[in-house]
A protein has these predicted regions:
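Periplasmic/cell-envelope proteins involved in peptidoglycan metabolism and beta-lactam response
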Residues: 1-293, 384-392, 565-581, 629, ...
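Residue-level preference for non-acidic, small/hydrophobic
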Residues: 38, 79, 157, 184, ...
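Second-shell loop/turn segments in exported
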Residues: 60-63, 94-108, 115-118, 138-147, ...
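Extracytoplasmic
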Residues: 67-70, 77, 86-88, 162, ...
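Soluble non-cytosolic domains of exported or imported proteins
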Residues: 69, 105-112, 147-151, 200, ...
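Beta-lactam-recognizing serine transpeptidase/beta-lactamase-like catalytic domain environment
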Residues: 83, 276-309, 323-556
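Conserved SxxK-family serine transpeptidase/carboxypeptidase catalytic domain
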Residues: 143-160, 170-183, 459-572, 585-600, ...
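Ligand-recognition elements built from short beta-strands and adjacent flexible loops
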Residues: 524, 554-568, 576-712
Length: 712
């Protein structure tokens, strides 16, 4: 009996086993079928959970294989670096407790201590940092306070050896001269490119208009990790751009503008020096400006006052009216008129401050800057003829002078009163570059030349010139004879006792100049503001009067303080030192050609070898760093420098302060910017004394004071 039961039990077990095996086989088959169908779907559609696998795979591969192009540098015409490349760092903290390197934890362990230490370096409170570290996220960042950290901040945090704290390096732009010509040189921001990596993109100034040349083209590596050497995937580093700006003149202009702007507490100020024969802008700046490294001062300050801001030019426009009248035979300098006021079709024109100087000749009316005189001149010309000259001098149209978003200007010319107003600079709005361009016809014997800023664009690898800036004649609105006659009348404005530009007289330095001042009212909500502190005070100069070389414009808008008895005395403190420096430089230009040195390539060499090679060529050398090989040179290889010019080399290691005796302020400031120490100055000219001895280490915390004196 028991054997029978056992046989039945075995049969039941066997039957169950077969059933389970059959079920398992069916289930496995279904699972394989489902997985197969899913894989077939993925292979066909190449999508998972709405993610495109082809794109994701390509991006992952390309991100690994991308070779980033190096952005080109920007130089001054004398070879000094104005914009360079650097690296900044984005800070992050790992909170995921599963992150280990072997047995070592790679996440933040002591959150309170980490918050305390980080708060001493980044602009975020200890409590705010701790809140981020106490979050439930696997990894956190620190907002804008943790982005774009400079090398000093990076080194400080790195030295703290904080577990779980890391950095993501990002490309950045470095501007060695900080605020110098900031609106001209411009600015970049960081954008994510097609490969998913950050790259620099120009958004202001030359960085913007020459972005295509500067940025270059990213490349890729092949599957072996080698850079592709030909075809569309080859990396092409950005080209270098050289500007027409002269770094020495620019430095002098910036320093003088700082003093003037701080002293007047003005709303804004502008100054430009242009080569009248070529149109090259040799120096230009505006206030307020900004620091492109920190972006301090940028918030409400994006407008370039050279080409984007329009204004009524005031009495500087009278010179254009004078030129038109002479050209048309309508200028009668010895004829007389009644000054003070003039009624035209129900409108009233008055001279400055409502003054009535009695009966004046038209010649005297020009040097005294009489509005009434030039209203009469416009009426003599006729509105149609006068408008023809406004167009011939290329007002109301962009100059296309290498800067972005240029304004065209505007005019009110319907009524007789408006037509008369334009003759002395009201009812017409112009840009600074338009005014300079118009005056170039007077300085350049009738030939009107376009202002320009880009000297050349060159391949950063070979040095081959890809674009060469050149003089462009945009027209000839007047004859050479007319231009010379206008310049003669402009000397009256300087030489006559009642001339409005007598403050700018350079005859004591051996130069006769031509000049015209301007006091332009500012219109708001359909009416002119009252008071000298609500005007634009300006001067336009042509130097020298005979065979001119330079045009210079200086203007200050709405000064709150008048540090001198006459605002023109204040503007002269900008004009005189810059113009005399430019004249002295041009006088020695012929000599300089024989003293030029073509810069050799010294990057990659030892400091001693590089120094020896440059000093042998007659150049002075200062080094930032003290160990390793030379990484960069301040004047690029192949460029020309004058004998005895200071060349700054950058290497590694600590920096030892050089003997700066005899250095110019510009040289000392450049070296301080490269090194990071704070330079304090007393006086002008050349360094005669320094507070720290040569050979002492300097860094970002150092303060070096220098005394300067003019050479006798």
């Amino acid at each position: 009996m028991s054997k029978k039961i056992k046989r039945l039990s075995n049969r039941r077990v066997s039957k169950n086993a077969k059933f389970f095996g059959f079920f398992l086989l069916i289930a496995t088959g279904l699972l394989i079928l489902i997985m197969g169908l899913r894989l077939l779907q993925i292979a066909t559609l190449k999508r998972v959970n709405s993610h495109n696998l082809t794109t994701a795979t390509r991006q992952a591969f390309m991100q690994e294989q991308m070779v980033a192009a190096t952005r080109g540098r920007i130089f001054s015409t004398d070879g000094e670096v104005l914009a360079d490349n650097s690296t900044v760092y984005d800070l992050y903290a790992v909170l995921d407790k599963n992150q280990f390197d072997g047995k070592k934890p790679k996440y933040v362990q002591d959150k309170k201590e980490t918050a305390k230490k980080l708060s001493s370096v980044i602009d975020l409170s200890e409590d705010d940092i701790l809140k981020r570290l106490d979050s439930n996220k696997l990894q956190v960042e620190f907002g804008t306070a943790g982005k774009g950290l400079n090398i000093d901040q990076y080194n400080k945090i790195k030295a703290m050896k904080l577990t779980g704290v890391g950095f993501i390096p990002q490309p950045a732009r470095y501007y060695p001269n900080n605020r110098m010509a900031s609106h001209i040189i411009g600015l970049t921001n960081s954008i994510t490119n097609a490969f998913g990596k950050n790259t620099l993109n120009g958004i202001l100034g030359i960085e913007d208009t020459r972005n295509k040349s500067l940025k270059g083209k990213d490349g890729v590596k092949d599957y072996l990790g080698n850079q592709v050497s030909q075809g569309q995937n080859q990396v092409k580093n950005g080209d270098n751009v050289t500007l027409t700006l002269d770094e020495k003149l620019q430095t002098t202009l910036e320093n003088r503008m700082d003093v003037m702007f701080d002293g007047t507490k003005a709303k804004s100020a502008t100054a430009v020096l242009m080569d009248s024969k070529t149109g090259k802008i040799l120096a230009a700046t505006q206030r307020p400006n900004f620091d492109p490294n920190s972006q301090d001062g940028l918030k409400d300050n994006w407008v370039n006052l050279l080409n984007q801001s329009t204004f009524e030019p005031g009495s500087t426009m009278k010179t254009i009216t004078l030129a038109a009248a002479i050209q048309e035979g309508k200028w009668h300098p010895n004829d007389t008129y009644q000054s003070g006021s003039l009624n035209i079709d129900g409108g009233r024109i008055v001279d400055a401050f409502g003054q009535n100087e009695g009966v004046l000749t038209y010649r005297e009316g020009y040097w005294r800057s009489s509005n009434v005189a030039f209203a009469h001149v416009e009426q003599s010309l006729g509105a149609t003829t006068w408008k023809k000259y406004i167009d011939r001098f290329h007002f109301l149209e962009p100059t296309h002078s290498d800067l972005p978003n240029e304004a065209s200007g505007s005019i009110s010319f319907q009524q007789a009163i408006d037509q008369a107003n334009t003759a002395y600079g009201q009812a017409i709005n112009v840009t600074t570059l338009q005014l300079l361009q118009a005056y170039s016809a007077i300085a350049n014997n009738g030939k009107e030349v376009k202002p320009y800023l880009v000297e050349k664009v060159a391949d950063s690898k070979t040095g081959k010139t890809l674009y060469q800036g050149k003089t462009t004649t945009v027209g000839q609105p007047i004859t050479a004879a007319t231009a010379k006659e206008v310049r003669k009348y402009m000397t009256d404005v300087v030489n006559q006792e009642t001339g409005t530009a007598k403050q700018y007289d350079l005859r004591d330095a051996g130069y006769q100049i031509s000049a015209k001042t301007g006091t332009a009212q500012i219109s708001e909500n359909g009416r002119y503001l009252d008071g000298l502190n609500n005007d634009i005070h300006s001067v336009m100069t042509i130097v020298p009067e005979e065979n001119p070389r330079f045009i210079m414009y200086v203007a200050v808008r709405q000064p709150k303080v008048f540090p001198d008895p006459n605002i023109q005395l204040t503007l002269n403190k900008v004009f005189r030192p810059v113009m005399l420096q430019a004249l002295n430089d041009s006088k020695s230009a012929v000599k300089s050609k024989t003293n030029e040195v073509k810069l050799p390539q010294v990057t990659g060499q030892s400091i001693d070898d590089a120094r020896g090679k440059l000093e042998k060529a007659g150049l002075r050398v200062a080094v930032v760093g003290s160990t390793g090989r030379v990484k960069t040179q301040s004047v690029s290889a192949g460029s020309y420098a004058l004998k005895d010019q200071l060349i700054i080399l950058k290497a590694n290691g600590k920096t030892l302060l050089p003997n700066m005796d005899g250095w110019s302020l510009a040289e000392a400031q450049r070296y301080a910017n490269e090194t990071g120490f704070n330079l304090k100055t007393d006086g002008t000219g050349f360094i005669t004394k320094q507070s720290m001895e040569a050979g002492q280490e300097v860094n970002g915390q150092s303060v070096v004071s220098v005394e300067l004196k003019e050479k006798e």
